[in-house]
């Protein structure tokens, strides 16, 4: 493994391959920006490839990210303390993502990509669930075709039309990294989930690879928007 002391390892983010993580992350962030998911520098994305983790920087306009802005970690690496994380590439004058320990939690579950968005629809459903079910409630919806875009769990295939999708919700914190414990607890309580909502904040979605994480994120956002409109029309999310 190349040590960052020997140079900034710029070769790790230099590739003509559009499927290289250093090229995919900027492309994903531009796509997410067009959906309104990562406005105002919010949100982020991370990809694991072999023993490297590629992460979008913090505090940067996501639609303007370039490959040379990407951080690279050696994997496995400690989540805490931040000083123990094994960065092998750090862009000059940029800050590591505050989402890093949450991304690492997803990779510990076998994910190949993790996405964090500030989707308005995700935020709205967390508020509606809190009002209708209280702070312990989770998001549930059934009998909607798009549910088929979400896995049942690792190695269990995809959900069906008649299944009830459940997404846990955790409370927001003042600092992003402080969400890690709650996220991990939700993962333990819902071992088949591929997403965790954060009340008044957004959502974390992960998948076995980039394509799966992206399409699952899109499917969930579709379902959240639909759920908000269904609620407005007085329609139940779960068909009895």
From Swiss-Prot:
It catalyses: 5-(methylsulfanyl)-D-ribulose 1-phosphate = 5-methylsulfanyl-2,3-dioxopentyl phosphate + H2O. The gene is MDE1. Its main location: cytoplasm. Catalyzes the dehydration of methylthioribulose-1-phosphate (MTRu-1-P) into 2,3-diketo-5-methylthiopentyl-1-phosphate (DK-MTP-1-P). The active site is at 145 (proton donor/acceptor). It comes from Paracoccidioides brasiliensis (strain Pb03). This is Methylthioribulose-1-phosphate dehydratase. Binds 1 zinc ion per subunit. Keywords: Amino-acid biosynthesis, Cytoplasm, Lyase, Metal-binding, Methionine biosynthesis, Zinc. It holds the Pfam family Aldolase_II. Zn(2+) binds at residues 116, 118, 201. One of its GO terms (biological process) is L-methionine salvage from methylthioadenosine. Its EC number is 4.2.1.109. It is found in: Cytoplasm. The lineage of its organism: Eukaryota, Fungi, Dikarya, Ascomycota, Pezizomycotina. GO terms for molecular function: methylthioribulose 1-phosphate dehydratase activity; zinc ion binding. Pathway: Amino-acid biosynthesis; L-methionine biosynthesis via salvage pathway; L-methionine from S-methyl-5-thio-alpha-D-ribose 1-phosphate: step 2/6. Belongs to the aldolase class II family. MtnB subfamily. Substrate binds at residue 99. One of its GO terms (cellular component) is cytoplasm. It comes from the Eukaryota. Its cofactor is Zn(2+).
């Amino acid at each position: 493994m190349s040590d960052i002391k020997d140079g900034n390892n710029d070769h790790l983010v230099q590739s003509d391959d559009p499927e290289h993580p250093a090229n995919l992350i900027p492309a994903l962030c531009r796509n997410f920006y067009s959906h309104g998911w990562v406005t105002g520098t919010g949100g982020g994305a991370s990809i694991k490839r072999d023993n490297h983790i590629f992460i979008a920087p913090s505090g940067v306009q996501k639609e303007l990210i370039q490959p040379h802005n990407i951080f690279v970690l050696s994997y496995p690496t400690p989540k805490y303390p931040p000083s123990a994380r094994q960065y092998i590439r750090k862009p000059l004058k940029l800050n590591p993502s505050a989402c890093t320990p949450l991304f690492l939690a997803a990779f510990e579950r076998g994910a190949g990509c993790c996405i964090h968005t500030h989707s308005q629809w995700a935020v709205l459903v967390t508020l509606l669930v809190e009002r209708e079910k209280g702070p312990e409630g989770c998001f549930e919806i059934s009998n909607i075709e798009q549910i088929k875009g979400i896995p049942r769990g690792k190695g269990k295939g995809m959900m069906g039309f008649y299944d009830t999708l459940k997404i846990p919700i955790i409370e927001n914190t003042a600092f992003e990294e402080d969400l890690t414990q709650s996220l991990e607890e939700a993962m333990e309580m819902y071992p088949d989930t591929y997403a965790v909502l954060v009340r008044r904040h957004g959502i974390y979605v992960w998948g076995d690879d980039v394509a799966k994480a992206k399409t699952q994120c899109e499917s969930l956002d579709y379902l959240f928007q639909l759920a908000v409109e269904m609620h407005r029309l007085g329609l139940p999310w779960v068909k009895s």
